[in-house]
């Protein structure tokens, strides 16, 4: 295993040699329909079989991530909301002007009634 440091990579790669066929060798074994295979692809006696030696090539493998880190447990941060009934007291003011059936001008102040109403808000 060889370490590859490249100015264009943000982190080093470790190269591992592997046997990979060249594209020319791969194309050599593909047979198209309605064609006669080349002599190199036909069955030959075992004494005359040609097996090219595969070239070694290098594959870039990224380094393993640090597995020593402690996993942070997930915590449910969404609290359950329960509805509560909150009684509220509101003051309602009714202003009523009293009109009498007469021709006299009424100069009295209008009557004001204040009632307390209790409602429940959910």
Curated annotation (Swiss-Prot):
Residues of the site described as Cleavage: 58-59
Protein name: Kappa-casein
Modified residues (Phosphothreonine): 98
Function: Kappa-casein stabilizes micelle formation, preventing casein precipitation in milk.
Main location: secreted
Tissue note: Mammary gland specific. Secreted in milk.
Organism: Mazama americana
Protein family: Belongs to the kappa-casein family.
Entries under Pfam families matching the protein: Casein_kappa
């Amino acid at each position: 295993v060889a370490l590859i440091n490249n100015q264009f990579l943000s982190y080093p790669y470790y190269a591992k040699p592997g046997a990979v066929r060249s594209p020319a060798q791969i194309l050599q074994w593909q047979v198209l329909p309605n064609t006669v295979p080349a002599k190199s692809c036909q069955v030959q006696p075992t004494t005359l079989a040609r097996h090219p030696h595969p070239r070694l090539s290098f594959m870039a493998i990224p380094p393993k991530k640090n597995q020593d880190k402690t996993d942070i447990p997930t915590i449910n941060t969404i609290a359950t909301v329960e509805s509560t009934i909150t009684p509220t007291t509101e003051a309602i003011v009714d202003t009523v002007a009293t009109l009498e059936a007469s021709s006299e001008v009424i100069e009295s102040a209008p009557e004001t009634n204040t009632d307390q109403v209790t409602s429940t808000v959910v």
